[in-house]
Design a protein with these regions (language model features):
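Active-site acidic/histidine proton-transfer and metal-coordination neighborhood
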Residues: 10-19, 27-31, 51, 89, ...
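Histidine-acidic metal/acid-base catalytic patches
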Residues: 2-60, 194-216, 220-303
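Catalytic domains of carbohydrate-active enzymes, especially glycoside hydrolases
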Residues: 54-72
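Glycine-rich, proline-tolerant flexible connector loops at the mouths of alpha/beta enzymes
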Residues: 68-88, 144-148, 188
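Catalytic-core regions built around general acid/base machinery
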Residues: 82-89, 166-170, 231, 263-266
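Short glycine-enriched loops at secondary-structure junctions
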Residues: 45, 98-101
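A structural motif
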Residues: 64, 132, 137, 239, ...
Length: 303
């Protein structure tokens, strides 16, 4: 065999071998992750099937111990209970569902002065208490609606704080926490009030309640402001929850520009024991995409 042909054949064999799962890799499949990464329904349906309990069981079998479901509050009560029972059996911790935000992004509920809209926001948060208790959730997402183009931002901030204090008073006796999620203007949600970390920090300091904290979505904040680790550090004492997604594309870590291994290593070093929601899609379809997602989290959790 010619020397050139030998090296070509050797290289092809090495590539093929690397693509196969090794025996050493197999035990890591069910090993818990170092951080509390929380998938959502649909991410594993190619490998686990469409039944939600089967997806929970599959997630637990490959090492996930947390879950989130934005629309949990919209599911039938018997389905909520079925999922809660399955999570308890599997040792899965429930993350966020949306208490206020779905269908309300365009409303001036928190930044306006309409009493009806403001009272409605409080009642939606109140209605979430029973859902949280049923599914053993501690955190719920709140998005404080639209930016008010007719009012100075400082006045909007004050109005937002006032209304969030009312919501916090409803949640505090139950030990529940609403997490405020800043959302980016440039790719997904132009015109929303809460968009940057310093804003969310200012608002939470103003509300001054253990029931009002920040949901730091790494995808959104990379687009809106960048400077991820320093901003996380600055707002650390008000952050209760994280979500992930790479940019551009909002797919699994490793498909974009964010150094997720370093970000997650930083969270772990700071002692974060909460949830990192996997609020993103997959870069590949079918069972291959499901497995690529698992592999991506194993890779960025390797620190």
């Amino acid at each position: 065999m010619k020397r050139r042909d030998f090296f070509a054949a050797a290289g092809a064999a090495a590539t093929a071998a690397a693509a196969l799962p090794s025996a050493a890799d197999e035990p890591t499949q069910g090993k818990p992750f170092q951080l509390g990464y929380a998938p959502h329904f649909g991410l594993f349906e190619n490998l686990a099937g469409k039944d939600h309990v089967k997806q929970l069981e599959f997630a637990a079998s490959v090492g996930f111990r947390d879950w989130e479901d934005n629309t949990m509050h919209m599911r039938p009560l018997d389905e909520q209970q079925r999922l809660a029972d399955a999570m308890e059996r599997l040792g899965i911790r429930m993350g966020v569902f949306v208490a206020y935000g779905i269908g309300s992004f365009g409303k001036l509920s928190f930044t306006g002065s309409d009493k009806k809209l403001r009272d409605q926001a409080v009642e939606e948060v109140r209605a979430s208490i029973e859902v949280a208790k049923r599914v053993n959730a501690k955190w719920m997402t709140v998005v404080p609606g639209a930016f008010n183009n007719r009012v100075e931002e400082g006045f909007q901030t004050a109005r937002c704080i006032d209304l969030l204090r009312r919501c916090a008073e409803v949640l505090e006796p139950h030990g529940l926490v609403m997490v405020l999620e800043p959302l980016n203007w440039w790719a997904n949600h132009p015109g929303l009030f809460l968009r940057e970390t310093h804003q969310a920090y200012e608002v939470c300091r103003g509300v001054d309640s253990p029931s009002c904290k920040i949901l730091f979505d790494i995808y959104h904040q990379q687009i809106q402001e960048g400077n991820l680790i320093p901003n996380i550090d600055m707002a650390w004492d008000e952050i209760a929850y994280f979500q992930a997604g790479d940019n551009p594309g909002r797919k699994e870590p490793g498909t974009g520009e964010i150094n997720y291994r370093n970000v997650f290593k930083h969270l772990h070093k700071k002692g974060f024991e909460g949830i990192v929601g996997m609020e993103h899609g997959k870069s590949l379809g079918g069972a291959e995409g499901d497995q690529a997602l698992i592999d991506a989290y194993r890779a960025v959790d390797d620190f």
